UniProtKB/Swiss-Prot annotation:
Transmembrane segments: none annotated. Its EC number is 5.4.2.7. It catalyses: 2-deoxy-alpha-D-ribose 1-phosphate = 2-deoxy-D-ribose 5-phosphate; alpha-D-ribose 1-phosphate = D-ribose 5-phosphate. This is Phosphopentomutase. GO terms for cellular component: cytosol. Keywords: Cytoplasm, Isomerase, Manganese, Metal-binding. It is an enzyme of class 5 (isomerase). One of its GO terms (biological process) is metabolic compound salvage. The keyword Cytoplasm applies. Its main location: cytoplasm. Binds 2 manganese ions.
């Protein structure tokens, strides 16, 4: 087998327009990329613009490029849902016909009672659906006084445990999350998330010591099939957590987008074969959920400036794809994810550019990765043959 690389950059939550069923999710009119551009008076994305991202949705400041240097399209989500797990799983061939479990009114006693019993905790604070930054602001001081963790959920399938790093050691917080993960498996909750924070009342901030504990996939992913075929898979950022480390041969923790982009660039100097699968979380975590279009715009422009250094590492015959896992429109009243198309911008050195159209599933990306490495996979439709000779 030729030694070559396929790079996936997931710009977490950078959707590009509402899906036809967005109304059913309360997301009609969402367009993370387009609405952000208009909210800030225009975006400066010269690299992505030349690659053709302006063809995907109207972006103020980024007109459609008549002769794009990359292949461009968008992907629709076939799975039911609009969360991180659902989006990433579908990319790698797992399409969910039923959404993962939600608990909009908080978690019932049959979940919390065994959690308290096994952890030895006297109780929890919160147990509501809430914005993470808001509930930490509201309950952080009481948490520090009592030692009881803050438990909350959201519009996603998540059980989140927040604790101050000076009140609860990180390893204790992670141990609590492992207990919750085991209890929640039968309930089909996608993720248990450790949400550590620091600071003092009124000035609490979450840290990059976050850790996700994901439910196991209901089938085998493209990642596992690659590893079976002895193709290395490097997960960067929260990718290993999302797939419960199955189908991952190496991993790199990151502390935000700038760190993730720099580590990806450095990684390509030492990895000469395999899949490099990267999640850039700041779009979602710092700006989408906080309804901060200015911050979102700055993060997009930061990524655009970094792309040439990453794409310049690729050799002829290799591929890099930029995409997203869902939307999180910072201009809407909601602070939750949005049901959107996601971008598909593909750089293949020496192959030019063109349109990939609207893909019927995120799984087309995984099918293309499998095709690229000569691995058999049934879900999705590969676009490798559309990338030119």
């Amino acid at each position: 087998m030729d030694r070559r690389r396929f790079v996936i950059l997931v710009a977490d939550s950078v959707g590009c327009g509402a899906l036809p069923d967005a109304r059913a999710y309360g997301d009609e009119g969402s367009d993370t990329l387009g609405n952000t551009s208009r909210a800030v008076g225009g975006l400066s994305l010269p690299v992505l613009g030349r690659m053709g991202i302006g063809h995907l949705t109207p972006i103020l400041g980024v007109p459609p490029e008549p002769s794009p240097l990359a292949f461009h399209g968008r992907m629709a989500e076939r799975s039911q849902g609009k969360d991180t797990i659902t989006g990433h799983w579908e990319m790698m061939g797992i399409v969910l016909s039923e959404p993962l479990a939600l608990f909009p009114r908080g978690f019932p006693p049959e979940i919390l009672d065994p959690f308290l019993r096994e952890t030895g905790l006297p109780g929890v604070l919160g147990n509501v659906a809430a914005s993470g930054t808001e509930i930490i602001r509201e309950l952080g001081e009481e948490h520090q006084r009592t030692g009881m963790p803050i438990v909350y959920t959201s519009a996603d399938s998540v059980f989140q445990i927040a604790a101050h790093e000076e009140t609860v050691p990180l390893e204790t917080l992670y141990a609590w999350c492992r207990v919750a993960r085991r209890i929640l498996d039968p309930y089909r909750v996608a993720r248990v998330i450790a949400r550590p924070f620091v600071g003092k009342p009124g000035e609490y901030v979450r840290t990059y010591h976050r850790k996700d504990f994901s439910i196991a996939t209901p089938g085998r992913t493209v990642l596992e099939k690659l590893v079976d075929a002895r193709v290395p898979v490097v997960g960067v950022g929260k990718i290993p957590d999302i797939f419960d480390r199955k189908g991952i041969t190496d991993e790199l923790h990151t502390a935000g987008n700038a760190d993730g982009l720099a580590k990806t660039e450095a990684l390509l100097d030492r990895v000469d074969h395999g899949l490099v699968f990267v999640n850039l979380v700041d779009f979602d975590m710092l700006y989408g959920h906080r309804n901060d279009p200015q911050g979102y715009a700055r993060a997009l422009e930061e990524m655009d400036r970094a792309l040439p250094r990453i794409l310049g590492k690729l050799r002829p015959g290799e591929v890099a794809a930029l995409t997203a896992d869902h939307g999180c429109d910072p201009t809407t009243p909601s602070t939750d994810h949005s049901r959107e198309y996601v971008p598909l911008v593909v750089h293949a050195p020496g192959r030019g550019g063109g349109a990939l159209g609207t893909r019927g599933s995120f799984a087309d990306l995984g099918a293309t990765v499998a095709d690229f490495f000569g691995v058999r996979h049934e879900t999705g439709r590969s676009f490798l043959g559309d990338l030119g000779p």
